[in-house]
Amino acid sequence: MDPQLPETDLVIFDCDGVLVDSEELSCRCLAEAMVKAGIEMSTERALELFLGRSTTALVDYCRGVGKPLPATFLPELAQQVRETFRSQLKPIAGIAAVLAELHLPYCVASSSDLERVKYSLELTGLASRFGPRLYTAQMVEHGKPAPDLFLFAAGRMRADPRRTLVIEDSVSGVMAAKAAGMKVWGFVGGSHYRLADGSALLKQAGADRIFAAMTDFWNEG
């Protein structure tokens, strides 16, 4: 038990927008790729629609607007995101210090695919902090906002959902954590929240606490 988190046995971190400052980068790549495929989209709109969601949500959206994605779309998008991350991705400021000070089991539960999570953590020097404790939407039937992924991660980590704390930056992620019966803190320090008021969105979704800098992680209240 960590004396600073007395009723918590496990901390689950989302990856994009919580560990790495990737949301604006990836949604910019997505918007550009969608426009190229003939689907109207902007970075801001992509953030509204797909923040914290899995690839399934993207595929379903495109089908819904009568523009099913070509077979080459997702592989080409993944490559573009990878190239963008290689030159521009940074860790969220202060996250390394939080992980170093955390004396509880912790893991990642992300809507991104496993290879992208691994790549993001390797680029930002965080991979060794998590080892194999990486759980993604590919591993469950229903992605966020369903609770499946967080319950799966807690099960793998042998933790009681009621004693699990989730750190999330998206509405769908906050909703998923609450549906899983977990405590959730909404983090709004990613660069994508320059474009929207994340605090109000995450609070409305059910976040138990909102904070905007990892230096405030331990300053609950």
Residue map of PLM features:
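Active-site neighborhood of HAD-like aspartate-dependent phosphohydrolases
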Residues: 2-48
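Metal-dependent phosphoesterase signature
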Residues: 40, 60-97
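Helix-loop "lid/cap" segments that line or gate small-molecule binding pockets
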Residues: 33-34, 54-68, 120, 154, ...
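An amphipathic alpha-helix signature
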Residues: 27, 31, 47, 55-60, ...
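Conserved SAM-binding loop
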Residues: 19, 106, 166-167
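Short, acidic loop-to-helix structural element flanking the phosphoryl-transfer center
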Residues: 6-7, 83-108, 114-118
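Asp-based, Mg2+/Mn2+-dependent phosphohydrolase catalytic module
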Residues: 1-9, 100, 113-114, 118-221
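Short helix-capping segments at alpha-helix termini
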Residues: 36-40, 65-69, 125-129, 158-159
